[in-house]
Amino acid sequence: MSDQPLFRIVDTGPLDKPALDEVSLPTAFSRRQALKFAAASLTLLVTRTGFAAAASGSVMGVRVWPSKDYTRVTLEYSDELKYTQLMVADPPRLVVDIEGVEFNSVLQSLPGKISEADPYIKLIRAGPNRPGVVRLVIELKSEIKPQIFTLKPIGEYGHRLVLDLYPSEPIDPLMAMLEESENSTEAAIERAAGKSPSRNDKPADKNKGDKLDIARLVTIVLDPGHGGEDPGAIGRRGTYEKTVTLSIAKRLKAKIDAQPNMRAVLTRDSDFFVPLGQRVQKARRVNADLFISVHADAFIKPTARGSSVFALSEGGASSTAARWLAQKENAADLIGGVNIGVKDPYLARTLLDLSQTATINDSLKVGKSVLGELGGINTLHKAEVEQAGFAVLKAPDIPSILIETAFISNPEEEAKLTDNEYQDQMADAILRGIRRYFAKNPPLAKSKIARLD
């Protein structure tokens, strides 16, 4: 995300009138004067985007996706939108006027969708401000750095107005990881150093050849595929890929964290959208030794079945199916809704990095190790690790694999994916594969934070 502020905050006084149709900019300024003042002083920026039909249209859906990373509010509309935005200070509020919209029951339901646990939104007020204009007043718990943008229709979605509310100071994933559970981290370090292991520690498996003897904690980033606006594949019984991938990833994280020499970090820990580039960026910020993206496969024929493992390819895909899958997964940003107005220089560098041969070789090694374990709990769709140009696997210095746990489009495997026992078996199998890989390929020291000595 860009470090440049989208607009400055000015204190224009409280918007405290109870009726939203009476809420207006402070009486000292008319709308035209306020806009002139903004242009002259550069202390207020009002952004207008998009186009609107002359007649009022209908908001077809409103959705709120809270998370500690950011909160997203989405309004789905039948036509393109024209909107105005304004930040107000003391107390902090975000005001959004939407033109050409009727205040219907869908918009009336928006305030009720705000959770008390939302990290950034205290409440939302919505109502008609003047003919053909609906005003949203979002009362905030703290200062934010908003990103507001529109998305064109794709898939089952119509036009969308997206309000992303980020903290004014971006969350550092490394510090968040360390603060998540300081006590458990200290206990893991003590166990790795050979001090008083907990009674609850259980070995991942008793197979020979996977004993780990390393000098520091191994950091593994787990990436539950999809999330938020992007449900991923949907099974015939209505199972969302984003739901099962998060559940499996959480189980795997718990098992990894129970190891004396490993720790896991999730790219998302709840139901919200994370752009592909940010998933990779999170892994690099915590000096990850391994990146694992968890998915559930799908195909037009319900008979397709089995588990698969994929790695990045510098050249072409290893099969037509692998190329098709990579194209499908890489489209996640379009469905989930990424703000193309904010450029990610890290992602640009990553996509241009062509010196990934060594990392890809390591990815193939860990992929082969994990695939061998998956074959013990499920049919393998392909007996070898496949390769294609997955954007989420393009960290140039982190071995990265994408696991298709099963086919959610297959009714039998969809049932497996929602079964707690199968999810647990899947997590165990992946962990065994990880341990086997690191037993043969101990990680090098990357940071003082990771070291045990």
Residue ranges with predicted function:
Residues 145, 263, 308, 382-384:
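Residues at or immediately flanking beta-strands
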Residues 2-219:
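Signal-peptide-cleaved, periplasmic/extracellular N-terminal interaction regions immediately downstream
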Residues 290, 300, 351-453:
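Active-site-adjacent mobile loop/cap segments within catalytic or ligand-binding domains
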Residues 189-345, 356-368, 424, 443, ...:
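Catalytic-core regions of hydrolytic enzymes
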